[in-house]
Design a protein with these regions (language model features):
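Short amphipathic alpha-helix that is part of the acyltransferase structural core
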Residues: 1-34, 38
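Conserved beta-hairpin
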Residues: 39-60, 67
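Short Lys/Arg-rich amphipathic alpha-helical segments
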Residues: 46-54, 79, 95, 110, ...
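Conserved acyl-donor/pantetheine-binding loop and adjacent beta-alpha core of acyl/acetyltransferases
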Residues: 55-88, 96
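Conserved acetyl-CoA-binding loop-helix of GNAT-fold acetyltransferases
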Residues: 97-111
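Short glycine/proline-centered loop/turn elements that form peptide/ligand docking sites
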Residues: 105, 130-133, 149-156
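Conserved active-site alpha-helix within GNAT-family acetyltransferase domains
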Residues: 113, 119-120, 127-147
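Charge-rich, low-complexity intrinsically disordered segments
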Residues: 145-165
Length: 165
């Protein structure tokens, strides 16, 4: 099974997307393009032919030094740590269990490595919405924040080891 990933455009038809979680559906259908046009975030769609089978959204952010896991703090100054934030990731119900989520995550990680070549980034972060999501990210060696176990991070050096340079 192959799919392609494209940055969200006005002409993409996303209205029929359904991942089973209304807030994610609503974001993609009503707010993703608006957020992208305001440069608040960037959304990428996964397609099987012309069907949207999943999406993810990236934004830059940071984490306070005190809220970061020890591995993120090590070797850095006591300032906020720059991050790429995976703001959203969703897979259409009909495509669940077919590794689309893993493919989307790996694409997001690869784009993060590219962004790190032009701006400072130390890690990639996500706020898992539930235990199932947390377990998904932990399979990719994400580590939890000491202040919130649902805030998960992976260092760029670990991303390189996971997906290559």
């Amino acid at each position: 099974m192959t799919f392609r990933i494209e940055k969200l455009r006005r002409d993409h038809r996303v209205e029929g997307f359904d991942c089973g979680k209304e807030p994610l559906n609503r974001f993609l259908i009503r707010f993703a393009l608006q957020s992208q046009l305001s440069n608040s975030s960037q959304t990428y769609l996964a397609f099987s032919q012309d069907e949207v089978v999943g999406f993810y959204t990236l934004a830059f952010g940071d984490v306070n030094y005190e809220d970061a896991p020890e591995r993120l703090r090590k070797g850095g100054a006591r300032h906020p740590i720059p991050l790429m934030v995976l703001a959203r990731l969703a897979v259409a119900r009909a495509w669940a269990g077919k590794w689309i989520g893993s493919g989307l995550l790996k694409d997001a990680l690869a784009r993060t490595l590219a962004a790190a070549e032009i701006a400072g980034l130390r890690a990639f972060a996500v706020h898992a919405k539930d235990d199932e999501a947390r377990a998904f990210y932990e399979r990719f060696d994400f580590i939890a924040s000491p202040s919130d176990p649902m805030h998960l991070f992976v260092l760029l050096k670990d991303i390189r080891a996971l997906i290559g340079p």
